[in-house]
């Protein structure tokens, strides 16, 4: 589950490839991100070691809403729920019956999930960005400008203007690929979706 924590707490196809650079990359990414005020999707996640060995496979559902709200539910057998109400993040582990609550770090280079739900107007202050377009797919590679981050690089891919997948690479070369499907954008989502009621008797850890 380390990769989900890292994300939340953040065959070649034929066709013409177009690369962009500089401020145009920033503008394109910002426009695509801000286009979706809410996103609902299923996700599947694969984590690979530096040598390509499969370390973990999980799946689940996620909902995000600007500004700063997100809900990620990873299915059993490694069930976990991560919820942000815009101020705090609650991580619920049902196996341990334990809830961990911490203040939301609004810095994009510390909580990459906020790319989908936070304020991205100053994204260029946190990352160097490069983009590549191939047919209906637009890829963006983001590299943190500082070294005090949880990952070395982050790739975000859009298909027909909607989020398609993300890939995080950490300092030891471990790769986490997250594929989204059944994506719905700009649906009405109540704020109550992002409130987690901790079960009675559960252990609560505040960081």
UniProtKB/Swiss-Prot annotation:
Pfam families: LolA. SUPFAM superfamilies: Prokaryotic lipoproteins and lipoprotein localization factors. It comes from the Bacteria. Residues 1-21 form the signal peptide. InterPro entries: LolA/LolB/LppX, OM_lipoprot_carrier_LolA-like, OM_lipoprot_carrier_LolA_Pbac. It is found in: Periplasm. GO terms for cellular component: outer membrane-bounded periplasmic space. Transmembrane segments: none annotated. Disulfide bonds: none annotated. GO terms for biological process: lipoprotein localization to outer membrane; lipoprotein transport. Gene3D superfamilies: Lipoprotein localisation LolA/LolB/LppX. Keywords: Chaperone, Periplasm, Protein transport, Signal, Transport. NCBIfam families: lolA. Monomer. Belongs to the LolA family. Participates in the translocation of lipoproteins from the inner membrane to the outer membrane. Only forms a complex with a lipoprotein if the residue after the N-terminal Cys is not an aspartate (The Asp acts as a targeting signal to indicate that the lipoprotein should stay in the inner membrane). PANTHER family: OUTER-MEMBRANE LIPOPROTEIN CARRIER PROTEIN (PTHR35869:SF1). This is Outer-membrane lipoprotein carrier protein. It comes from Pseudomonas putida (strain GB-1). The gene is lolA.
